[in-house]
Amino acid sequence: MTATASHTRARPLGASEIEHATRIAEPDFDLLDALYRTDDPDDQARLLARVVLSAFDNYYAVSRRIPALAQAAFEARDWPVTVRLSKIRIGLYTACIDQLVPLLKAGLPELTTDEQLWPTAEAELLAAIEGRYEADFAFAFWQSLRRKLVSDEWRPVSYDAGSTARRTTSPAAVLKTTATTLPITAEVIAGILDEAGFRVPWRDRDGDAALAAQAIETALEPLSPRPGEPVKIEIADSGFLRNRGACLVGRIKLRDRGDMPMRNLPLLIALLNEKDGLVVDAVLTDSDELQYAFSSTLANYHATNPRYHELARLLYELMPKRPLGTQYSCIGFHHLGKVAVMSEILAEHRKTKEKLATAPGFKGTVAIAFTMPSSAYVLKIIRDHPTDDYKFDYFDGLDEVLRKYNLVHEIDRAGSMLDNIIYSNVKLDRAMFAPELLDELLEAGIGTVTLDRGALVFRHLIVQIKLTPLPLYLANASAAESRAAVINLGDCIKNNAAADIFNKDLDGRNYGVSRIRKVYLFDYDAVEPLTSVTVSRDGAAPGEFDNGMVFRPQEMLEGLRIDDPGLRRAFRDAHPELMQADYWEGMQQALRDGKVPKVMNYPASRRLRR
């Protein structure tokens, strides 16, 4: 964040400015030439390590510039640029590797088969990155490039060599502390807002600070606060920016009082940049609400502080229901999150000795989903061919379905679609699998799964956060919980539409409910761009679709299979526009015009001005 705030509207970023700032530098051709020319194995190892590290440094420099650009776009209210920056960032890692791989293959083809060179070169790389903060990230980059060249199996390798082995990270290094006494005043909150340093005038800073202080005071009441009691407000020295919004994140700490233990309250101050100035839109003080705001179902945050380990640890402490690996992913460090998630899955198995078995719910027609009972994750493969219950006349095939899962990973998921981690060439011990699942994987996933002695090798493996399928949830939930879920289902469908995503298989079985009782779409084999769908105003013909691409809004409830009349009525009353063609055509036009629709990332009840 910047140190001071000015009172002039920020300048929009130009297209050439963004292109220049996010352009990946070319590989070091002098180093490449030296690598190609030498026949000495030690020189080859040393030069290969230098070439790859140079490429990583190019990537990392650009990736660290993007959060500052995102802040500038937020300050200028340049919403299309914020979306563009998110897309650039998420594709940057792969683009940088893809830039280098063909050069190495062409100039040193033996890299794909030389089993002696890689260990020696890896030792050179580890020595070169010793002591660097981002050493683990550089090593992840090395592993990614090696797999591209060698087509080796994916392993959750983390950087832990020598004296730079990372100990348990504390978030203290990224926290700024304000010490005061209860009650927390508007002046204290105003000071925290000023320290954020946005280069945008506030619409009503003092009024917002007063409302925020009041919201915090209400949230503290269950902790039995006393007037004059010492309190610390810890705020991350980082802006978190995403699309139209920004937020300040931290916690409020009340120390041990004798009759009360240490008490912590999560804190998120959500900011919007409106036409007439910066405003505090909401204050969140509940861990589950923070989890929704930082959900992997949303686009990733740009964090302006580069200390990603401390930020991920802070987020985990604030949202302990959410695995640590996904905390890395939600601030854009997918490849570190990828390592952390697989490490967590393997650790879960070692700890519980549970078997991977078919996931609860209805049998997937396109995917086979499996999990361990106490795991936080669900794993999936795509079938070679859909089951007989498949609804559509034509199946696009494995590669096209994987493309759709990748598409969802790369877009703003608008708070209503699970992110996916897609692994290639993963080997898992055969003993991890229940016999029935093992048989199904080998029979229905011949193009994806092979048996290699005592292990299963997955050509592709999709991992998602575990949800309860919506029909199962409704079968066991109370009337109030069920009503809230179907209303949230409508919000989910609207948010998907705002992200230009339409699920042509509008079946409740493709949606699930999270631990924090939010509804998400989690199956993507039937997703299409909303802008490519024909919305029909003619309800005469039966069925939802003609040729798979004509949508009749008036038939939505039949497609969702909500059988309970009361729940159908609740859905219809809460979201009547979803059954109207005007809504869908209006959303399509907004998307074609390049507008960025607003998406609600937190409960409306937490907004300061409703």
Swiss-Prot record:
One Pfam family of this chain: AceK_regulatory
Location of this chain's protein in the cell: Cytoplasm
Reaction catalyzed: L-seryl-[isocitrate dehydrogenase] + ATP = O-phospho-L-seryl-[isocitrate dehydrogenase] + ADP + H(+)
InterPro entries found in the cross-reference section: AceK_kinase, AceK_regulatory, Isocitrate_DH_AceK
EC number in record: 2.7.11.5, 3.1.3.-
Active site: D419
Keyword RNA-binding attached: no
Name used for this protein in its record: Isocitrate dehydrogenase kinase/phosphatase
Upper classification of the organism: Bacteria, Pseudomonadati, Pseudomonadota, Alphaproteobacteria, Hyphomicrobiales
